[in-house]
Design a protein with these regions (language model features):
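Death-fold homotypic interaction modules
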Residues: 1-96
Length: 96
């Protein structure tokens, strides 16, 4: 199972993550609405991950995981394919 596939299973988007990503300008209102319109958590996560296309967006995503009590997801990223350099996690290459 690749990193993106596993993240679609373990990220919890519905309790603060999406709103925080909106406030950090990672998502636009339109993108937020599109993600939220997906019927299942798996599909919401997949839609969200598809929108993370830059290193800056991925860095903010990882930071937001920590802020929304999803440290276990951040730990999974850094231990299973995420490249930890200079205190950041680079996962944009792995998500695409």
């Amino acid at each position: 199972m690749n990193l993106k596939s596993h993240l679609t299973d373990i990220v919890e988007p519905d309790f603060g993550l999406l709103d925080e990503l909106l406030s950090l300008h990672v998502l636009t209102l339109h993108e937020l609405a599109d993600v939220r319109s997906e019927r299942t958590v798996y599909k919401r996560n997949n839609a969200l991950l598809e929108l993370l296309t830059t290193e800056d967006q991925c860095d903010k995503f990882v930071t937001t995981l920590k802020r929304t009590d999803q440290q276990h997801v951040m730990n999974y990223i850094t231990q299973n394919g995420g490249q930890k350099h200079y205190g950041i996690v680079t996962l944009s290459v792995m998500l695409n």
